[in-house]
Amino acid sequence: MALSVAGRHAIVTGGGSGINLAFTKKLLSRGCSVLVGDISLRPEAKELLKQYPHDPSTPPSADRPVALFKKTDVASWPQLSALTRAAEEAFPQIDIVVPGAGIFEPRWSSFWNPPKSLTNPDSPSRDDADGEPGHYAVLDVNLTHPIRLSQLAIAHWTSRRIPGSLLVVGSMAGYVHGIGSPLYFASKHGLHGFVRSLGRLRDTVNIRTAAIAPGAVNTPLWSDDPDKSNLISSDEIAASAEDIADAMLELLENPQYGDGTILEATAKGTRVVPAFNAPPPDIEDGGISEYEAGVSRQWEKKITEEGLKV
């Protein structure tokens, strides 16, 4: 029997823009209330909140879903805990958790831009060379935040003995590789392994886990980053955020999924990525071949002429 998001309650991080905003719209249109956790909201996200106002005196329902926002830095564990508490206070229960916020190895947290130091004073990196412990922001956001939010979600569901759905935003980068963004690829490889590892929860305690794995998608993740946007044309990015949102809804509502499923999504359709001996993805379909070619040229020039400064 098909599942339904109608009348459910969700947390979506990164819902202020891009894929996660498109998915937030999709959930609301299907009668699912959403609490968005993000650093900020794009104008279209602010308009969405106005369309689905929250009246604390009236519980949300399938006929009257609500949209709320809590400013959240997902790299902060206390802020993730506060986001979860806010959802518990606003909703009767939490049914769906989507750790969707992510960054695509920006110049300020990149393997090829090591942290600023006495011997590397001009680095654009915001990562701290003297951090105790040391860490990279791209891993904090892309990998550690979904793991921590998953702990909070599973604690909510198991303490109440209720079912739940954990839907993580992965990437085709979780099973391919590229020299230009090794931290990003590492984060998505780790994320897919994490999701698969939780797969037994579905048949043990009725907690469904899955990841969507898009190729390049026409979102601010590309367009707002000058290091990315000048290496790929909008014509090559065939998939829209709405395409991916449709596939994410399928992951939630199709009962055959949820046991650690990794669902690849491109403009041409979807496929379940098997855990072993998976056929390679079509990089052209994924829309990243032009980007990889451009970033490889940049990397080769930098590493051969300048080396790596730390």
Walk through the language-model features, giving the residues of each.
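The beta1-alpha1 cofactor-binding region of Rossmann-like NAD(H)/NADP(H)-dependent oxidoreductases
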Residues: 42-44, 71-85
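Amphipathic alpha-helical dimer-interface segment in Rossmann-like NAD(P)H-dependent oxidoreductases
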Residues: 89, 102, 137-161, 199-200
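Residue(s) in the substrate-gating loop at a strand-loop-helix junction
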Residues: 171
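Catalytic Tyr-X3-Lys loop
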Residues: 114-150, 167, 191
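Canonical Rossmann dinucleotide-binding motif of NAD(H)/NADP(H)-dependent dehydrogenases/reductases
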Residues: 2-35
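C-terminal helical subdomain
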Residues: 211, 228-286, 290-310
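Active-site-adjacent segment of SDR/Rossmann-fold oxidoreductases
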Residues: 30, 156-160, 176, 197-208, ...
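Conserved glycine-rich Rossmann-like NAD(P)H-binding loop of the short-chain dehydrogenase/reductase
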Residues: 30-47
